[in-house]
């Protein structure tokens, strides 16, 4: 024996072994063996009886070696044989036999004879290993499908839970802790969802001890699905009613609890919500809800009628500046004032219609900042008819205009028009300052004047000292 554990045998001793016995030894040590001439022609095929019958591979004898393999395996074999093996050394390759009737993966140990270059290919059938690998791949694919199905179910569950308008809690009967809840329930309790997950339900809902509370809910869920328990939310001391549904999941009993307002409060809230919805849908004044950046979230039919819009879908998502005659200037004045003081009254402007028309309107705005996303509500009225009734009394009460009226018959028309122009100019500047909350930069934008021109006119009409006061 050599140092690496292999055995040495003299050639003379090996020659004393009969060829038939040597063939039996080779076939018993492998599944299939090929003897290939230097010209790459198969001279002999030896098959282990447990692997298959020799007739199955009889056609291989006399065939070219490359014809026995798939094109990829034949090319791989040629490339490796071009580089080796050296006589007395071997190389291992995994090759695939591709015949008309079958495909056979085999791992070959290839040895080259030192005398004439004859090749001996000793092969082991890789079909069992390939089948195991295929089963592993199928199992992996099945696991991935199960994982995707589980994710889909979890997504559907989460969407259903969050889309339900009622506050919902899922409570474990064994631990008395909150297993899950939707955002509506978290908002009603007055905490975040992360704070309430796995929190003891008895610490959030005050009424009875934990055991009595859960047993009472389970009893109601089993006997009267419409029954309810009145409890108090500890954080806000708010009265709520709790209805429950009992179910099992993963061996644990769970309660699906629906939180609702106490009856008296719920009746008042429901009435208010219903009346508000009716006012929005059927009111004669146009109503619009905006995001904080001026994007339209909702608009009623009166607004669609006022702007000649075809449908609410064509309005939602557009900037309200698209409907203002002064565009972004009007919108910035509106948003700045509403965000600063929370509301805006009697803001007069013009709305553009979808057919290049304009309507003079008066709008009021209110900011709802106590929501997750701040919302601005607008009430818009057509002021074309009201202008005539409002302007004349104002004109009669304005000292400058009364003086102009008294000039008729005592001054030329040119002088009267010049005096009127200055009065109207002063009134416009005062109105712009009032609308912008004395913000001169915004007033200049509103009047399409430069800041320098506005200051000149303020000094001209004595409004600088008035603003300082």
Swiss-Prot record:
Residues covered by the PAS domain: 153-225
Family matches, as InterPro entries: Homeodomain-like_sf, HTH_Fis, PAS, PAS-like_dom_sf, Tscrpt_reg_PpsR-CrtJ
Keywords, ordered alphabetically: Carotenoid biosynthesis, Chlorophyll biosynthesis, Photosynthesis
Protein's GO biological process: carotenoid biosynthetic process; chlorophyll biosynthetic process; photosynthesis
Keyword hit for Repressor: no
Pathway: Carotenoid biosynthesis; spheroidene biosynthesis
Superkingdom of source: Bacteria
Example GO molecular function: sequence-specific DNA binding
Short name of any one Pfam family annotated for the protein: HTH_8
NCBIfam families associated with the record: PpsR-CrtJ
Identification of the protein by name: Protein CrtJ
């Amino acid at each position: 024996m050599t140092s690496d554990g292999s055995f040495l045998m003299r050639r003379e001793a090996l020659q004393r072994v009969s060829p038939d016995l040597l063939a039996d030894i080779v076939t018993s040590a492998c599944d299939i063996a090929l003897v290939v001439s230097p010209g790459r022609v198969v001279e002999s095929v030896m098959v282990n009886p447990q692997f298959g019958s020799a007739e199955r591979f009889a056609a291989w004898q006399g065939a070219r070696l490359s014809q026995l393999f798939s094109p990829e395996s034949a090319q791989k074999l040629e490339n490796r044989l071009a580089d080796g093996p050296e006589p007395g050394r071997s190389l291992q390759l995994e090759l695939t036999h591709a015949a008309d009737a079958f495909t056979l993966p085999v791992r070959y140990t290839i040895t080259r004879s030192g005398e004439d270059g004859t090749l001996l290919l000793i092969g082991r059938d890789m079909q069992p290993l390939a089948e195991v690998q295929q089963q592993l791949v199928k199992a992996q694919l099945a696991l991935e499908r199960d994982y995707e199905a589980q994710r889909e179910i979890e997504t559907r569950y989460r969407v259903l839970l969050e889309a339900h308008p009622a506050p919902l809690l899922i409570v474990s009967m064994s631990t008395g802790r909150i297993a899950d809840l939707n955002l509506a329930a978290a908002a009603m309790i007055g905490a975040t969802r992360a704070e309430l997950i796995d929190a003891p339900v008895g610490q959030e809902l005050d009424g009875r001890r934990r055991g009595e509370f859960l047993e009472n809910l389970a009893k109601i869920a089993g006997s009267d699905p419409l029954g309810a328990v009145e409890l108090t939310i500890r954080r806000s001391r708010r009265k709520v009613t709790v209805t429950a549904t009992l179910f099992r999941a993963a061996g644990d009993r769970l309660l699906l609890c629906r939180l609702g307002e106490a009856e008296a409060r719920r009746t008042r809230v429901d009435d208010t919500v219903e009346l508000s919805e009716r006012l929005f849908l059927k009111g004669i004044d146009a109503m619009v809800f905006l995001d904080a950046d001026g994007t339209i979230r909702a608009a009623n039919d009166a607004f669609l009628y006022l702007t000649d819009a075809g449908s609410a879908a064509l309005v939602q998502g557009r900037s309200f500046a698209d409907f203002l005659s002064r565009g972004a200037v009007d919108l910035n004045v509106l948003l700045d004032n509403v965000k600063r003081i929370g509301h805006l009254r009697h803001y007069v402007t013009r709305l553009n219609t979808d057919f290049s028309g304009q309507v003079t309107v008066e709008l009021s705005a209110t900011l709802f900042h106590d929501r997750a996303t701040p919302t601005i509500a607008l009430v818009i009225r057509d002021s074309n008819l009201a202008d005539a009734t409002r302007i004349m009394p104002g004109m009669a009460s304005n000292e400058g205009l009364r003086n102009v009226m008294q000039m008729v018959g005592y001054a030329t028309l040119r002088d009267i028009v010049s005096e009127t122009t200055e009065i109207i100019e002063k009134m416009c500047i005062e109105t712009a300052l009032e609308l912008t909350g004395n913000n001169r930069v915004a007033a200049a934008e509103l009047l399409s004047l430069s800041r320098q021109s506005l200051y000149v006119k303020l000094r001209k009409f004595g409004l600088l000292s008035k603003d300082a006061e």
